[in-house]
A protein has these predicted regions:
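Gly-rich Lys/Arg/Thr-decorated short loops/hinges at beta-loop-alpha junctions or inter-strand turns
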Residues: 22-32, 94-98, 194-205, 250-252
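Glycine-rich phosphate/diphosphate-binding loops that line cofactor/substrate pockets in enzymes
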Residues: 1-3, 43-58, 77, 118-120, ...
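Active-site diphosphate/adenylate-binding microenvironment
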Residues: 196-268
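Conserved small/polar residues in nucleotide/adenosyl-binding loops
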Residues: 269-275
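Glycine-rich beta-alpha junction loops
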Residues: 11-16, 63-65, 92, 155, ...
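Glycine-rich, acidic loop regions that bind phosphate or pyrophosphate groups
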Residues: 11, 91-194
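Conformationally flexible catalytic loops at phosphate/diphosphate-handling active centers
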Residues: 2-53
């Protein structure tokens, strides 16, 4: 139902001590939650028309793109349109971080160029993100010049934190696949030049003091471990890994998102790929 992922069910101790039996239904029927996750073609075409007319369009890819395994078709859409991409932390890897149209992560743990692109874009085309406070900052200052398209499988996420101009409730992969059928190239050369200027003005880096530091470790990972699954725990190293480790078609990253569950990393090493 809606956004997939873990759910916390908190039961009193005396209930947990009782015995019982349960059967999980094949079809879950929740009276108050019945989203239609099939792509509304009319809404999608409106969004794509808006995209084609934008002078400073920007894709925002969230974790929903990765959960839906939509990376390949998303890259196809990005390359067809020539629209640059920023990602959330959980969206990292939606497109290779080495791709020329990838700018960086946005938000409080993001890159200068990515945050400037969000601030100056005139269309923010968002897919699979819930607009949490780590990426938005002050809500009334977020993407102040932009019309916003929001594609998300969870109807409860639409316009919850950020008002959107075109809402589309849909599975990310289904929506992006339909986009690939209809999108046309956008005129973004001047916009891309401005983004490159921001990248050169404030590149993502950290201070070096002559001894081995985090950047040396991340550079070694990028150089030596091409086919790897990167798993982080929670804390500053998680944010730095999300910023500095390149995530490509061969190298994946797994980390905890909103709940910040410390101890997550060790268990994920065991269950993500137990044969490796």
């Amino acid at each position: 139902t809606g956004k997939p992922g873990p759910v916390l069910i908190d039961l009193p101790k005396d209930v947990m001590a009782e015995f019982g039996s349960a059967e999980y239904p094949k079809n879950v029927n929740i009276r108050g939650y019945k989203p239609n996750t099939s792509v509304h073609i009319g809404q999608l075409k409106r969004a794509l028309k808006m995209l084609s007319k934008a002078k400073r369009p920007l894709f925002l890819a969230g974790g929903g793109v990765n959960i839906a395994h939509a990376q390949e078709v998303f890259r196809e859409v990005v390359e067809k349109t020539q629209v640059p991409v920023v990602t959330t932390g959980m969206g990292r890897g939606a497109i290779s971080t080495k791709h020329p149209l990838f700018i960086g992560n946005l938000g409080m743990h993001g890159a200068y160029a990515a945050n400037m692109a969000v601030s100056e874009c005139d269309l923010l085309f968002s897919i699979g993100t819930r607009f949490n406070d780590r990426i938005t900052g002050k809500l009334h200052e977020f993407a102040p010049h932009a019309q916003i398209v929001h594609i998300d499988i969870d109807t409860a996420s639409i316009s919850r934190n950020i008002h959107v101009d075109i809402p589309i409730v849909a599975d990310a992969k289904e929506a992006i696949t339909k986009m690939a059928e209809y999108v046309e190239p956008c005129s973004t050369s001047k916009w891309l030049a401005q983004i490159d200027a921001w990248k050169n003005e404030h590149p993502l880096t950290m201070r070096q003091n002559g001894v081995m530091g985090p950047l040396d470790i991340f550079n070694a990972i990028n150089e030596k471990f091409d086919d790897a699954i990167i798993v982080t725990d929670v804390g500053q190293h998680q944010m730095l890994t999300s910023q500095y480790v390149d995530i490509t078609e061969n190298r994946q990253i797994i980390m905890s998102g909103g709940l910040g569950t410390m101890g997550y990393g060790l268990s994920l090493i065991h269950i993500s790929e137990p044969t490796r």
